[in-house]
Every structure is written in C-alpha cells, then in structure tokens.
Amino acid sequence: MPVNLGQALGLLPFLAKAEDATFSGSDVIQQRELANPETARQLFRQFRYQVMSGPQETLRQLRKLCFQWLRPEVHTKEQILEILMLEQFLTILPGEIQMWVRKQCPGSGEEAVTLVESLKGDPQKLWQWISIQVLGQEIPFEKENSARCRGDKVEPALEAEPTVEVVPQDLPLQNTSSAPGELLSHGVKEESDLEPELALAASQLPARPEERPTRDQEVGTALLPSLQEEQWRHLDSTQKEQYWDLMLETYGKMVSGVAGISNSKPDLTNMAEYGEELVGLHLHSAEKMARAPCKEDRQENDKENLNLENHRDQGCLDVFDQAPGEAPPQTALSDFFGESEPHHFGGESVPEALENLQGEGTGAHLFPHERGSGKQLGQHIQSSSSGELSALWLEEKREASQKGQARAPMAQKLPTCRECGKTFYRNSQLVFHQRTHTGETYFHCRICKKAFLRSSDFVKHQRTHTGEKPCKCDYCGKGFSDFSGLRHHEKIHTGEKPYKCPICEKSFIQRSNFNRHQRVHTGEKPYKCTHCGKRFSWSSSLDKHQRSHLGKKPCP
C-alpha cells in the first residue's frame, strides 16, 4: 500500500557539492532526532567516509543516518520499500525532470510516474518551470504548491496576488543537441550531478570585461535561439544577468577549483560570436575527455607491450562509463520526448553499438584508438553547428584510423618465453618467468643462505628464524607467520569445510587433504620409488619405504 511521502521527499534547498558534504561524528550525534525527513535523507545520501574515524565508526554513523531517514520504528517494511523505490526512481530521472518532480512532492512511485507521464503530453510545463527558476519569479500556483509541500498555510492574499509574466509561453522543446537551447536544460541540474566532461567547455569561455552588455539582440540569439528577439528586449539587465549566471553555473563553477579557470562572465556583447561554439564544445568535449587519458596510456604501454595497452584502454572505458561512488547514470531528455531522427553512438547506429556491447564486451575486436575514442561508450555524438569543430573531429578520427591500420594483430606481439613458449600479459611477467629457467635469484637469507625469487616468499622465510607471528586468531589468539595459515586455522573455529568429495560426500578443511582423499577413489599413486619402481599414494608412505633400501628402521 503506497505511503504518503510528501514530507519525506519534499523539495528543500539542495546540499552543496558531494565533496563539500562531509560530516563528522559530532555532526551525526547532533542530528539524532531530525524533525525533517528530507534533511535526514540528504545527510544519508551525502555522507562520506572519514579516514580518521575508521571503518567501524563510519559504518556505525552510516547505520544511524539510515535509521533516521527510513525510521523503521514508525514505517512498515512495505513503506520503507516504497521510500527506497521512489528515491531510486527520482535519482535516475534526468536532472531537469527530477527537480520538477521533486517540486511536486510525490507521495509514491505511482504518483511520480504520473507526473513524468504528464510531461509527455505537455512539455511546455517543464520549460515554463525552468524559465521561472531562471528569472527568479514564481507564479501563485507555484507558490501554493511550495507552501503545501512544506506544510505551511497559504495566505489568501498570496493566492490573489497578480504576477506579471515576462517568460514566453510558446517556448518549443528542442531535443537536438546542435541547438544551444539544450544548454538551458543542463543549467538547472544539481551540482553533484554535473558531468565532468562539461569542464572542457568552461575553459573556452573568455574573461568578461567590466563593460556592460549593449547588443541585446545578439545576446538573446546566442544564448537561447528559441527566445524571440522581441521577447529578449523586454528583459531588463537583472534578468539577463540571471540568464547568464545559469549558463556559467553549469560550465564554470566545477572548473574553478580544479583548473584555476575564472568564473568571471564573458562580455555579453561578444556572446553571439561564439554562442554556437559553446554547443560544439559541449558535444566535442565528451569525445576528447574519453580519448585524452587513453592516449597517454598508449605512450607508456608502447615501452612494455601491446597487450598491457589493451587492458589499460579497457580500464579507461570502465572509468568513463561509471565513476565510482557517484549517482546512477541519468536518462536523457530525448528518451522522454522522442525524436524522429535516429541516434548515433560514436559513428555507429544503435543496433550496431548494441551488437558491439553484447559481443565480446571488452572491445578486443577494436583498435586501441577506437576504444579510447568512445566507440563502445555509447556517447551521443551528433553534428555540431560549428563547421570548424566538425572538421577538426573528422580529421582527428582519420589520423587515428591510419595509425590503427599500421598496427599488427595483438596476438602476434604478446610476450612469449623462448624456452617453453609460454605467453604473458606483461614484459615484467616474462622477465620474472625467465628466472625459473636461468636459476637467477634476488633474495638471499643471511642465516641459512637460502635464495628466493619473490620478496613475499623471502619475508615469510625470515619469520621462521625470527619467530615472528604477526597474524593473530580472533578466537583463540594463536599466532601465525602468514595469512594462509591463519585462514586454515580459523576454519577449525567456524567449522567451515569447503572441499567436499563428490563420491563419499566427505568434507575437508584444506585442499591438500581433499586431494589426498581423492586418490583413495581413483587409485592414483603419484609417488614412485627410484630404487625398485614401486608406487605409493602418499609421500609419507614413500619415505618409509625408502628407509628399507637404506637399512634404516622407521621411526616409532
């Protein structure tokens, strides 16, 4: 049964960026009894790991924040499930639609779906709300909804107060990314949901001089082509400043602390000269952001081997597809308001891109430059209104294609051992393997003169001389020199026996005991006496037998 969650998911001012929303242990204690469920929800969602507190304290604080948000002492399991489903549904919505739906304070998932469906029939509703937020004005209907969400009483005078609307009512909803109007839709997103690739566009904005804007017609045409010139003239200087602030908030804020780019506004009089370039940069930035790190990796990988390059390029794709710890990817507006033209992903049609993603899944059939350019990322690459940017992009793709054709197949360049023919992923692995043929060792024990290839084996061996046992059992306190011995010992306390014989169903703690037991059923005798050729199933039986050839009596 749906529960009314208007209070729990009502619209409140969003928190700052995720990196700024950190809470210490004292902050959590102060929020023990939160009267506002929305504040508790945002405290839980924005909570970050504190290194100084440690994992146990962090988990305790996170559990407390979760209890404050979901309130299991008040809500039933069905109500808690409804809260989580509604929260996840709102999170995956596009930023513009998400903010609008949260403004309406949906009480359940079904109500949120109804609100989203209503936008399909009347997309003007969303654009009107966006324009009102940009201009800083509210009509009485919006004020009444906001007051009801907060639980305040609506004054009669507020309902009857006339409002002069300067926002055009016939703004068309544009979905083509070649139109700069799409930049407005990105301006109302939360700062934590802004995609990092937009930072490249901010670096192209020139610093704004101290002069005031004079050519209003060019400004209106460059910022929002759907805004008619006649309507742009009716906006005063303050409203135009707020219009630009929205654009700058999208492209400038998140870059100011990283790249040192100024947040100063460019001269609005020159805005028409590069208004179209903003759109081209927005489309072109995702391509360059995906390709740039992979290009640096290729320069390093050429020094080692081509196969390592393959793995690192795949890593670049994984990182670009979904950044860790961030919100789930949001759906594009075009998925709600369909287009007649087919989408293209990295130069491929939708079926071709899906076939590549569902094939090998690793991009092994692509050249490294194709993986780095986002051919499997599903990036929405469309034609830009700037001819120079389109020509530049095509030229870069052509050069990358020529470089890729000159490369030899991957399998022919894998590092291979000349002695045994074994192949490896890295040259470093091949060098280490070759020591087994040459007998070369790097680590020598000063006490017993024993040599080792690996440093980890050398450290374990030294503990036999020093008696050091750093690994302690939590149950009985017994010490062990390595973690493998500790893991085997802990199975005695837990009763875990992961190795089970499929014939007699007998279980064993250690793999070695399980392997010895299987020889009883198979009759395998791998240990052979070098004197008489007799074979044995266990090494201990072979040792006893060899003593008979040497004339020694077995130990009692």
Swiss-Prot record:
Q: Where is the KRAB domain?
A: 218-291
Q: Which GO terms describe its molecular function?
A: DNA-binding transcription factor activity, RNA polymerase II-specific; RNA polymerase II cis-regulatory region sequence-specific DNA binding; zinc ion binding
Q: What is its main location?
A: nucleus
CDD domains per the UniProt record, alphabetical: KRAB_A-box, SCAN
Q: Where in the cell is it found?
A: Nucleus
- In this chain, the stretch annotated as Disordered covers 169-195
Q: Where is the SCAN box domain?
A: 41-123
What keywords tag this UniProt record? DNA-binding, Metal-binding, Nucleus, Repeat, Transcription, Transcription regulation, Zinc, Zinc-finger
Which residues belong to the signal peptide in this entry? none
GO terms (BP aspect): regulation of transcription by RNA polymerase II
ZnF C2H2-type residues are 415-437, 443-465, 471-493, 499-521, 527-549
Report the PANTHER family cross-referenced here.
Answer: ZINC FINGER AND SCAN DOMAIN-CONTAINING, ZINC FINGER PROTEIN 18
Report the family membership: Belongs to the krueppel C2H2-type zinc-finger protein family.
Please describe what this protein does.
May be involved in transcriptional regulation.
In Swiss-Prot or TrEMBL terms, this protein is called Zinc finger protein 18
Q: Tell me the classification of the organism that encodes this protein.
A: Eukaryota, Metazoa, Chordata, Craniata, Vertebrata
